[in-house]
Amino acid sequence: GLVDDDELKAALSVMGQATYNQEFECSFIGNVKGSIYGELISKLEDEKRIARVPHDPSYPVNTAWDLGYNDSTAILFYQNVGHAINIIDSYENNNKAFPHYAQILKEKDYTYNEHIGPHDLDQTDFATGRTRREVAYQLGLRFKIAPKLSIEDGIHAVKMLLPRCYIDVDNCKKFINALRHFHRMYKEKDRMYYSKPNHDWSSHMNDALRTLATGLENEKFENVKVRQQQYMSLIHI
């Protein structure tokens, strides 16, 4: 039967907003307890930023990566359009070597500008004696390395970035679901959430997004440094 307003208010005060949304508002975000980006994703949906975001050939495409050795590698394809970050495409696979991903990039037929990779690209592969960055270079992929930050700092960078994003609803289905699902586990015994996010199928796409967010933050910092150096050199002329 119908639930009256007083019962709904009482339920909200007992359950908390997320569980209430799940029970009474059919909220998809509400299904994930401890959701890290849930509220931000809801806001993106409300603002129609998760929609058709077609590739604009007049802008180059950039990529941000999470690289796994034996598990998944995830790639986000995005375009910087003014202040906005248009995430137009995504790809994930597992147990594939670098040539596979280089081929995927070729097949997509985008004009690429830069590729941002995680810091572990510089680790040496004992089987080949080369770093994965060197292997990528030989395949025509020149990577910039995102700074090594704590997971929490990376999550903070993502939270700063998401309000600037538009995400393609067709090409980024798994990425969107991963954003919704990404969460911290609840410790019943201590009645609190673990500080680290739960590692599961949603981790790889979210790690690629962290690479993107921290890479862009670093770029901003580098640009400020360059401007400061230029300013100082003018002063000393």
Q: Regions from the language model: what does each represent?
A:
Residues 76-200, 219-226, 230-233:
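Mg2+-dependent endonuclease catalytic cores in nucleic-acid-processing enzymes, primarily RNase H-like
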Residues 235-237:
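Conserved small/polar residues in nucleotide/adenosyl-binding loops
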Residues 1-64:
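ATPase catalytic-site recognition across NTP-hydrolyzing enzymes
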Residues 56-80:
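Gly/Thr-rich phosphate-binding beta-strand-loop-beta motif of the actin/hexokinase/Hsp70
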Residues 154-158, 206-213:
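Glycine-rich phosphate-binding/hydrolytic loop that grips phosphoryl groups
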Residues 24, 66, 75, 179, ...:
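Short, conserved catalytic/metal-binding motifs centered on acidic residues
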Residues 68, 91, 209:
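Anionic group-transfer/hydrolysis microenvironments
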Residues 212-220:
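Short, hydrophobic alpha-helical segments
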